[in-house]
């Protein structure tokens, strides 16, 4: 069973790894830069990030490996692929290689890296097994909310969108929402500014909107709100 960590706990954990990342690449928080999850995974966590076909229907976007294991996938044309994965492998579905999938790809890498972080920090609480995830939204197991998936999603968001970086991007984009209301329309200049922020940070529109709502920059209940979410 996963240890029950709050959003604040996960934010502190993310901060430690972001500090290591910034130190490794000579980045200062006085001039913060977006976090590249693949560089974080490889240079800071020692993970091997690979891109391979994982499914033919989009049901599996990524997996993280703690033990040597085999993985078989049948592609749409009937081709059977058999791969052997090793510990510390993070495998991302090659369908996410397109530029249009940058946000999804980055979040998937960060999510799988988060599983490794949590397993390393709390080895008695996280099973050493292959973890597959099917989508960016919260994954439920047996119809019940999963703490492990919620924590991996939340830690991934904290790694990609730490508060100090989001605040810096808000200032850079001159985002101004005095009443906290955002209209998803080209007529609202803030909409384009937030799209620009998302592109700079390598995340999706949905991801940055949720983060801005959590930071109370935008009013309203975060979309995809999960029963276990602690804001």
Where are these regions (language model features)?
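Active-site hotspot residues in diverse enzymes, especially metal/ion-binding acidic/histidine motifs
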Residues: 1-231
């Amino acid at each position: 069973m996963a240890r029950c960590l709050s959003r604040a706990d996960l934010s502190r954990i993310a901060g430690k790894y972001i500090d290591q990342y910034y130190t490794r690449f000579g980045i200062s928080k006085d001039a913060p830069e977006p976090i590249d999850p693949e560089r974080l995974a490889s240079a800071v966590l020692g993970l091997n990030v690979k891109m391979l076909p994982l499914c033919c229907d989009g049901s599996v976007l990524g997996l993280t490996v703690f033990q040597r294991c085999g993985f078989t996938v049948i592609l749409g044309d009937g081709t059977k692929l058999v791969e052997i994965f090793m510990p510390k492998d993070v495998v991302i579905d090659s369908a996410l290689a397109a530029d249009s999938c940058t946000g999804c790809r980055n979040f998937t890498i960060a999510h799988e890296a988060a599983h490794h972080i949590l397993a390393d920090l709390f080895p008695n609480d996280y099973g050493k097994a292959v973890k597959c995830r099917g989508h960016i939204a919260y994954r439920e197991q047996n119809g019940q909310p999963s703490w492990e998936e919620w924590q991996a999603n939340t830690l991934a968001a904290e790694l990609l969108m730490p508060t100090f970086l989001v605040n810096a991007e808000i200032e850079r984009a001159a985002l101004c929402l005095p009443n906290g209301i955002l209209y998803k329309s080209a007529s609202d200049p803030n909409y384009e500014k937030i799209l620009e922020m998302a592109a700079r940070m390598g995340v999706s529109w949905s991801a940055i909107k949720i983060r801005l709502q959590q930071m109370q920059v935008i009013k309203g209940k975060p979309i995809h709100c999960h029963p276990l979410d602690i804001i």
